[in-house]
């Protein structure tokens, strides 16, 4: 086996590498200097080890303290909260520093809060608590500790339970195709309510503001509520259904509070659609009256006017109102800027009546010889609801004679039944 020949100067290559790695200053030092230098380094290592041990001990102590505080916070948060409202948030300047002391400009101002509890007591909190003060604003509902009054949690906004019940959770199943003879009205409703929510960019490109609200008016049974239900079914927005008589309350200010809470809930869950049925219950023309009930109804309408065209309008909230008596509504409700678009739903014509009866009988076992055009000619002055009643009554007549399908004669008998219940032309206006 061949061996590597030693270098000419007689030095080992490994020793040469070690010498190259050592600083020249150390190579020039004497043995005594090297010993003292090594002793100093040993002392520094000993000091650093003790410092590491001290830091580890401090970290362990802090972890235990954090664990204790976390358990204490958990215990405090499981206690029943005292419900309070934030009245005001203050920037408190700390001027207690001694003259000439170093001042931290970032920590010079601290956020403080003034709260009012459900016991009608008002407290000033120099320390807010567990909630970031930047997340709070006056009027927020918070849960505080009943002993220290520190804010433990921000609670959801409080709404009237009657307003929460107005939100439609289960979507209606109606579609635009279920409404016959109202193609123009459906198009106007889609343009005013649905398009601003689904295609907002088209309005921005044209530089126009969509209508804030829609008023549907016409005789009873012409499909006003059904159109609103179709809009609720076709849009993914929050849908609130209010009835005018619901807003007429016994106590002063109760109806106005319902209107305020309804719009506040719609603003929180925007985009939202508010449907007010039977608007004439609260929207009648204002007049001088000494009765407290009349004045309360007028106050409710004034709150509705304020929400429709208030100081802070919201384009993500659309209002659909329906009424049979547009002639008694207050002019302030009808002016532009509030209920901008008025959609009239008149009695259906002959073609519309035929279409309505075809829609309501499409799932029924109807004989192919049924002539809906002839039925439409026989149902003069019928509204949409009465046309639907004809289909239902025809099915009941066929059921009465144990038939498997509905004949044309059943529809004719049903028309006579509905006309007999009608007896005379009804007058819906006083």
Curated annotation (Swiss-Prot):
Main location per the UniProt record: cytoplasm
Disruption phenotype: RNAi-mediated knockdown results in larval arrest and up-regulation of the aspartic protease ddi-1, indicative of proteasomal dysfunction. RNAi-mediated knockdown in a ddi-1, png-1, sel-11 or sel-1 mutant background results in reduced or failed expression of the proteasomal subunit rpt-3.
Gene responsible for this protein: rpt-5
The keyword Nucleus is annotated on this UniProt entry: yes
Family matches, as Pfam families: AAA, AAA_lid_3, Prot_ATP_ID_OB_C
Residues the entry annotates as binding ATP: 218-225
Name this polypeptide is given: 26S protease regulatory subunit 6A
Function according to Swiss-Prot or TrEMBL: Component of the 26S proteasome, a multiprotein complex involved in the ATP-dependent degradation of ubiquitinated proteins. This complex plays a key role in the maintenance of protein homeostasis by removing misfolded or damaged proteins, which could impair cellular functions, and by removing proteins whose functions are no longer required. Therefore, the proteasome participates in numerous cellular processes, including cell cycle progression, apoptosis, or DNA damage repair.
Domain of life per record: Eukaryota
Subcellular localization: Cytoplasm; Nucleus
A GO molecular function held by the record: proteasome-activating activity
GO biological process: proteasome-mediated ubiquitin-dependent protein catabolic process
Subunit structure as annotated in this protein's UniProt entry: Component of the 19S proteasome regulatory particle complex. The 26S proteasome consists of a 20S core particle (CP) and two 19S regulatory subunits (RP). The regulatory particle is made of a lid composed of 9 subunits, a base containing 6 ATPases including the PSMC3 homolog rpt-5 and few additional components.
One GO cellular component term: nucleus
Family classification: Belongs to the AAA ATPase family.
Annotated keywords: ATP-binding, Cytoplasm, Nucleotide-binding, Nucleus, Proteasome
